[in-house]
C-alpha cells in the first residue's frame, strides 16, 4: 500500500523543489513560481504558516513531474 502524502509547510515543499533542481523565478503576492532548467514549472502558495493540503501537494508534484517517492526521498 502506498504511503499517504503528508501535509507540509510551503517552506518544506520549496526546499524539496530546490533539491531536485527547481529555482524560484518570480513571486506574485503569496505565490512563488518555480522553474526547472528543462522547462518544467509549478506554483507554490505561501500563506503564512498554513499547511499545503494533500490535494494541492499532489497537483504540485504532477506539474513538476516528481513522483511521491522522489519527493519523500528529498524531504
PLM ranges: what are they?
Residues 1-75:
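Basic nucleic-acid-binding interfaces
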Amino acid at each position: 500500500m502506498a504511503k499517504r502524502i503528508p501535509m507540509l509547510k510551503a517552506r518544506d515543499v520549496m526546499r524539496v523543489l530546490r533539491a531536485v533542481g527547481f529555482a524560484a523565478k518570480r513571486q506574485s503576492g503569496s505565490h512563488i513560481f518555480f522553474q526547472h532548467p528543462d522547462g518544467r514549472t509549478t506554483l507554490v502558495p505561501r500563506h503564512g504558516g498554513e499547511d499545503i493540503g494533500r490535494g494541492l501537494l499532489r497537483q504540485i508534484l504532477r506539474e513538476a513531474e516528481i513522483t511521491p517517492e522522489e519527493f519523500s526521498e528529498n524531504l
